[in-house]
Amino acid sequence: MIHDDFQQTPLTSYGTQKLVGELILADYTRRGFFDGVGIRLPTIVVRPGKPNKAASSFFSGIIREPLAGVEAILPVPRSVVHTHASPRSAVGFLIHAAGLDGAAIGPRRNITMPGVGVSVGNQIEALRRVAGADAVKLIREEPDETIWKIVQNWPTRFDAKRAKALGFTAEENFDAIIRAYIEDELGGKVGAR
């Protein structure tokens, strides 16, 4: 479980860049250049559009593609656990953060947002509940060592007590994340039912 005050030791350049951004935001807020708040997002799924080369792309792909009736590749074991929120929640996080009083946030300006911590297997079962067995049949397991080496080092669950106390909210389960995608991006209709 990763807490807001967890000592970060990034293992990638991307993680290092994110940490540097958080430190600059905190310092510039402390110095009065602006009143900032850093939003630590969980992995956002289901992202609209086409798959990309990001190591995390499959988290959206194994839901998005089957909902469109297209095959998706699962490059990691179903036992992988990760924390997610929908694009709808991400927008809500940003809007809510913009309205917060800096005094309520305090000197620790970077806040871990809430999300749903689930295994890939749980994601797939949520897809089955929401869209049916035909959608799940479109997921092909094809291990990719390069992606696995990256993903296996990612934190799996986060403590978002502070964010929740400040009024941030996200979905309570992965079914709701899938339903938000269907409502927001597919006009409420599923292609692979």
Feature annotation, model-predicted:
Residues F6, L11-L19, N52-S60, T83-H84:
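Short-chain dehydrogenase/reductase
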Residues R64, R88-G99, D175, R179:
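Amphipathic alpha-helical segments that line or abut small-molecule/effector binding pockets
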Residues G49-A55, S79-G92, P107-L127, A180:
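Substrate-binding strand-loop-helix patch
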Residues M1-G38:
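Catalytic helix-loop patch of NAD(P)-dependent Rossmann-fold dehydrogenases
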Residues V20, I24, Y28, F58, ...:
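Hydrophobic alpha-helix immediately C-terminal to the catalytic Tyr-X-X-X-Lys motif of short-chain
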Residues E141, P155-A165, E172-R193:
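Amphipathic terminal alpha-helices
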Residues P66, F93, A97-V151, G188-A192:
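Mid/C-terminal beta-alpha module of Rossmann-like enzyme folds, strongest
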Residues A26-V81, P87:
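NAD(P)-dependent short-chain dehydrogenase/reductase
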